[in-house]
Amino acid sequence: MESEQMLEGQTQVAENPHSEYGLTDSVERIVENEKINAEKSSKQKVDLQSLPTRAYLDQTVVPILLQGLAVLAKERPPNPIEFLASYLLKNKAQFEDRN
């Protein structure tokens, strides 16, 4: 019986070659998913470079720019360019995921 348990333990170690470093299967899956997502995002960035100008702008700048211009028109600040620049910088994180 003990030999069967040892074999089972050895089988588990063999299934996870990085267990000696303390990596669990779930951590390995997370790492693999991150690698896949990184590859997809790099492919997407390449795709952005190959887009026509209008499509590139529509996917990258237009969404945040329209929202910023809407707020600008509503608030009508005395320094609209600085206001818009500040708005874009403050809110860029919301839109970076989409690029």
Curated annotation (Swiss-Prot):
CDD domains: DD_DPY30_SDC1. One of its GO terms (molecular function) is protein homodimerization activity. This is Protein dpy-30 homolog. It comes from the Eukaryota. Belongs to the dpy-30 family. Its main location: nucleus. Residues 1-26 are annotated as: Disordered. There is a cross-link at K35 (Glycyl lysine isopeptide (Lys-Gly) (interchain with G-Cter in SUMO2)). Homodimer. Core component of several methyltransferase-containing complexes including MLL1/MLL, MLL2/3 (also named ASCOM complex) and MLL4/WBP7. Each complex is at least composed of ASH2L, RBBP5, WDR5, DPY30, one or more specific histone methyltransferases (KMT2A/MLL1, KMT2D/MLL2, KMT2C/MLL3 and KMT2B/MLL4), and the facultative components MEN1, HCFC1, HCFC2, NCOA6, KDM6A, PAXIP1/PTIP, PAGR1 and alpha- and beta-tubulin PAXIP1/PTIP, PAGR1 and alpha- and beta-tubulin. Interacts with ASH2L. The interaction with ASH2L is direct. Interacts with ARFGEF1. It is found in: Nucleus; Golgi apparatus, trans-Golgi network. The modification N-acetylmethionine is found at M1. The gene is Dpy30. Keywords: Acetylation, Chromatin regulator, Golgi apparatus, Isopeptide bond, Nucleus, Phosphoprotein, Transcription, Transcription regulation, Ubl conjugation. The keyword Transport does not apply. GO terms for biological process: endosomal transport; transcription initiation-coupled chromatin remodeling. GO terms for cellular component: histone methyltransferase complex; MLL1 complex; MLL3/4 complex; nucleoplasm; nucleus; Set1C/COMPASS complex; trans-Golgi network. As part of the MLL1/MLL complex, involved in the methylation of histone H3 at 'Lys-4', particularly trimethylation. Histone H3 'Lys-4' methylation represents a specific tag for epigenetic transcriptional activation. May play some role in histone H3 acetylation. In embryonic stem (ES) cells, plays a crucial role in the differentiation potential, particularly along the neural lineage, regulating gene induction and histone H3 'Lys-4' methylation at key developmental loci, including that mediated by retinoic acid. Does not affect ES cell self-renewal. The modification N6-acetyllysine is found at K35. The keyword Signal does not apply.
